[in-house]
């Protein structure tokens, strides 16, 4: 999101492939011409990819664990392999990176870690039981790590977005509602699949970026061990 420029840090842009990284850098540089952007191609959904990332950048001041996959599939069709793949990518990627980066942050006495979870972490989706389970687990991991930061200026939090207009979500919605325009498909998706949403639309990725940027800033020093909901009010609970 654009707000990351307020942090005045070098931003490492990670992706699974070099082409994806270059595409992201091109888009970001168009909007963030003054930002210090560095690309890193490594598949952090694997142990080898995380090792590449950690050896290339042994320490960071801010870690945003945004890597994740999802798929809509009935519980009885979710194989052991599907569960294991979801766990390896959605959970172990963040665990492997945080294990090294958090240690360095604690030694230096400052830092930020943010896990990008999901509203499915507190409102599990029956058509994505394995995905929802990993998103719930992220909340527990983040809170456990936050307990290790006592007496430092390090914070560990989770942000829980609702349905967000990413490339993957747009394709998913078009596959579910073929023959409709993108706008029509999005409206239909919200009406039929997320009817409790108070905003009644998909979330712009920049809106999530703004929240993450604030949580990573010095102004958010009192926010630690928290689950920050950014799901447009679709979860009907008070806390």
Summary of predicted features, one role per range:
Residues 74-76, 82-87, 193:
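Substrate-binding pocket helix/loop in short-chain dehydrogenase/reductase
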Residues 98, 134, 142:
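Active-site helix of classical SDR
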Residues 118:
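Residue(s) in the substrate-gating loop at a strand-loop-helix junction
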Residues 150, 155, 223-225:
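Short, small/polar-rich loop/turn modules that mediate ligand/substrate recognition or access, typified
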């Amino acid at each position: 999101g654009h707000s990351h420029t307020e942090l005045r840090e070098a931003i490492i842009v990670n992706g699974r492939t070099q082409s994806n990284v270059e595409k992201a850098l091109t888009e970001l540089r168009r909007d963030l011409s003054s930002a210090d952007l560095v690309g890193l191609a490594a598949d952090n959904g694997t142990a080898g990819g995380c090792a590449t990332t950690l050896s290339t950048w042994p320490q960071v001041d801010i870690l945003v664990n945004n890597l994740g996959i999802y798929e809509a599939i009935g519980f009885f069709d979710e194989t052991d392999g599907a569960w294991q793949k979801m766990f390896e990518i959605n959970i172990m990627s963040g665990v492997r990176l945080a294990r090294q980066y958090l240690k360095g942050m604690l030694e230096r006495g400052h830092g930020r870690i943010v896990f990008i979870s999901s509203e499915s972490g507190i409102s599990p989706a029956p058509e994505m039981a394995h995905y929802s389970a990993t998103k719930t687990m992220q909340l527990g991991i983040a809170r456990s790590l936050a307990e290790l930061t006592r007496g430092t200026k390090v914070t560990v939090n989770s942000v829980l977005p609702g349905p967000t207009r990413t490339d993957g979500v747009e394709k998913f919605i078009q596959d579910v509602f073929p023959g409709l325009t993108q706008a029509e498909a999005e409206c239909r998706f919200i009406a039929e699949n997320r009817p409790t949403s108070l905003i009644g639309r998909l979330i712009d990725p920049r809106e999530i970026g703004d929240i993450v940027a604030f949580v990573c800033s010095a102004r958010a020093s009192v926010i630690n061990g928290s689950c920050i909901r950014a799901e447009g009010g679709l979860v009907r609970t008070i806390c």
